[in-house]
Amino acid sequence: MENFRLEQVELPDLAEGQILVENTVNTVDPYMRGRMNDVKSYIPPFDLNKPMTGGAVGVVRESRSEKFQVGDTVSHPLGWQDIAIVDEGQAKPVDLNVAPAAAYLGILGLTGLTAYVGLTRIAEIKEGDVVFVSGAAGAVGSAVGQFARHLGASRVIGSAGSEEKVARLKELGFDAAINYREGDLAGQLRQAAPEGIDVYFDNVGGDHLEAAIARMNTFGRVAMCGAIAQYNDTQPPTAPRNLALAIGKCLTLRGFVLGQYLDVAGEFRERMAPLIASGQVRYDVTTRHGIEAMPGAFLELFTGGNTGKMVVQM
């Protein structure tokens, strides 16, 4: 917490093509942790002593844009602040009659698109696949499990960190759910997937990836979306120790970042949005309140404090 501070600043006047947005909901996401390391990556690190950024939904209070009027609700990438000056090209209209604001930051937004891309483009899910997803009670993981069912999976297995989350996964339609905090992850997964795994959607890395490799069937596919178990590690990871199995099993392990697949958004909305709107795909939101809660909400992502999408209501 000592690495964050809250500041009040004077905002400049709007330039042509800009809007002033009062944020109502801000998101925090695990990928932000990677932007706190000064290393070369797919996205530049955050600048020291400058505002954090992230997804947000808010109401236009002033406008010098022909695209947006005062009172419009928009989503944009300048969260972590209560008021933002946004270029019109960064904003997208949001219809709160279709879904609440948090949904546009989660299941209907980049979170849902991440799950869909990982399954369809990276893991190339097929009819009858057995799918395992780690971090399954999180925003992406819970979407993966439900999308997989509608994309033809014959069995869906998830891992989570409490009995409450395990119960929730079963309510969401997972065939089996593992509480990894009970230990013997490999043994639990062996019991949950007696016929092996065809697709592993990895949000965790480490021992989860090791356990999944051990249960993967020949020609299995791993979509490597995140490695939350390692983001705060100061020592080299101890797992996976069985990567050589990928050779004999002819496995495909493929990492991805969403920015390379934004052109899939239209297909995602066409196929998945009706399922979300009808309630066939459900989603959870964990809410904290006030701009002061942003750092704490972010840190909770790494200790299991969220079920589904973590947002901060202004």
Segments (PLM) and residue ranges:
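A generic alpha-to-beta junction signature in SAM-dependent methyltransferases
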Residues: 125, 193, 216-217
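C-terminal hydrophobic helical "lid"/dimerization subdomain
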Residues: 259-314
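Mid-domain Rossmann-like dinucleotide-binding core that forms the NAD(H)/NADP(H) cofactor-binding site
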Residues: 105-183
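N-terminal Rossmann-like NAD(P) cofactor-binding module of classical short-chain dehydrogenase/reductase
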Residues: 75, 132, 178, 200-201
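NAD(P)H dinucleotide-binding glycine-rich loop of Rossmann-like/cofactor-binding domains
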Residues: 52-59, 67-135, 280
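Short amphipathic alpha-helix with an adjacent loop that forms part of the alpha/beta core around
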Residues: 184-195
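Glycine-rich phosphate-binding loop and adjacent beta-alpha segment
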Residues: 169, 207-281
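Glycine-rich beta-strand-centered segment in the early N-terminal region that forms part
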Residues: 10-28, 36-80
